[in-house]
Amino acid sequence: MSSGGLLLLLGLLTLWEALTPVSSTDRPEFCELPEDSGPCKGLFHVFYYNSDQNQCLEFIYGGCYGNANNFKTIEECKRTCAA
């Protein structure tokens, strides 16, 4: 196989890996944490993964503390936690 063919194959494999959904066994443990607004009083619309409903949901984050199950976009939440 030529070097160009190998590069194409490598590129396709990389793309396939990026587009393959994360399975529940590969999901980071913090995806199981409950939503946590934290003690601060900000009003940031963010997303968390709800493991009971197997989906990303919006919640209001106060802006400090909380936990790692906190994403700025629904896309980031789905990419990280949703199967």
From Swiss-Prot:
InterPro entries in the cross-refs: Kunitz_BPTI, Kunitz_BPTI_sf, Prtase_inh_Kunz-CS, TFPI/VKTCI-like
Gene Ontology CC entries for this record: extracellular space
Gene3D superfamilies from the UniProt entry: Pancreatic trypsin inhibitor Kunitz domain (4.10.410.10)
Keywords: Disulfide bond, Protease inhibitor, Secreted, Serine protease inhibitor, Signal
Domain BPTI/Kunitz inhibitor: 31-81
PROSITE patterns: BPTI_KUNITZ_1 (PS00280), BPTI_KUNITZ_2 (PS50279)
Disulfide links within the chain: C40-C64, C56-C77
Tissue and organ expression note: Expressed by the venom gland.
Pfam families: Kunitz_BPTI
Site description Reactive bond for trypsin, residues in chain: K41, G42
Localization annotation: Secreted
Signal peptide: 1-24
SMART domains: KU
Family: Belongs to the venom Kunitz-type family.
Role according to the record: Serine protease inhibitor.
Protein name, UniProt field: Kunitz-type serine protease inhibitor nigrescinin-1
Biological source species: Cryptophis nigrescens (Eastern small-eyed snake)
Lineage: Eukaryota, Metazoa, Chordata, Craniata, Vertebrata
